[in-house]
Amino acid sequence: VQQRWNRRVFLQVAAAAGLLAACSKPKPAPGTAGGGAVTITHLFGQTVIKEPPKRVVSAGYTEQDDLLALGVVPIAVTNWFGDQPFAVWPWAQPKLGTAQPVVLNLDNGIQIDQIAGLKPDLIVAINAGLDADTYQKLSAIAPTVAQSDGDAFFEPWKDQATAIGQAVFQADQMKSLIDAVDRKFADIGQRNPQWKGKKALLMQGQLWQGTVVATMAGWRTDFLNQMGLVIADSIKPFGSDHRAVIPRDHIKAVLDSADVLIGTTESPEEQQALLAARGVAASRATAENRHIFTTKDQAGAIAFSSVLSYPVVADQLPPLIAKILG
């Protein structure tokens, strides 16, 4: 099992267990300060950005997509998973062009000294697991945008995108990009009324210690809701926060309750392993071919949940759903 995949699954499952997440609280919207500066309100206070930044470090797992979508090419990007060139996935690579940003990682925490050496004028660290001490150290280097509430990783994609749009003085452009994603998924739902109310499961592409991990209804499944689907209620008893961890003895019943099952696999080997798992192999869902298995790029696009990756999902997932639901 690849180390990067392990880190991806750990973060998402740990969030489900409440290890990396706290209760969300209402968050004020970013605003403008005097003299044309922008003020971003976040978990650790407020950050004032006096002018459009030119040397931006993307210090979290997914912020590069939001920056690149606005034409802001970061001087450093943080690797998450997937072994992509410069930690930028195919949907964002055209926006990167010939740039060659420094690639950071969070394997041992944020690389503060390396970031300082890059002399940034903005650090975007919304999906970086910041604590107060690390925030203070980064803020001593350059204005730093942190997560907006207690979720150390993976706050709602629209909140992250909106804050980044504000931080680079392109709030209106970001709003247009977000609205376009919403329209794209809503249009798919309107064109496929037969999908309305059908039950779906969005599952990790690998088992977690013999269990199936599925995504609870929430912002991560909004794109499915916009297309008319609903997350099957059968996962609720096994859910905590963002993720449901379904024990071996319950896998068959949970899977059988869904009309379509989307497994975010990254390889044919992962597909085969998932189908061979006890409970999955025995399910009617498997016998009746209700499974969709993603490619590596499709799994990445769902995981990144960004204004650049979601259009890939909207283009490539519906034909697969249509094979099952009509």
Which residues does each predicted region cover?
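Extracytoplasmic substrate-binding proteins
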Residues: 46, 133-207, 303-326
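N-terminal secretory signal peptides
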Residues: 1-5, 9, 13-22
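Extracytoplasmic low-complexity, Pro/Thr/Ser/Ala/Gly-rich segments
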Residues: 31-68, 81-83, 318-325
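Proline-aspartate-enriched helix->loop->beta-strand connector
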Residues: 119-125, 143, 257
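Structured C-terminal subdomain patch of bacterial secreted/periplasmic proteins
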Residues: 254-326
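A short, structured surface patch at a secondary-structure boundary
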Residues: 63-114
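Basic- and aromatic-lined ligand-binding clefts that recognize polyanionic substrates
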Residues: 55-70, 173-234
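Bacterial lipoprotein signal-peptidase II cleavage site
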Residues: 23-32
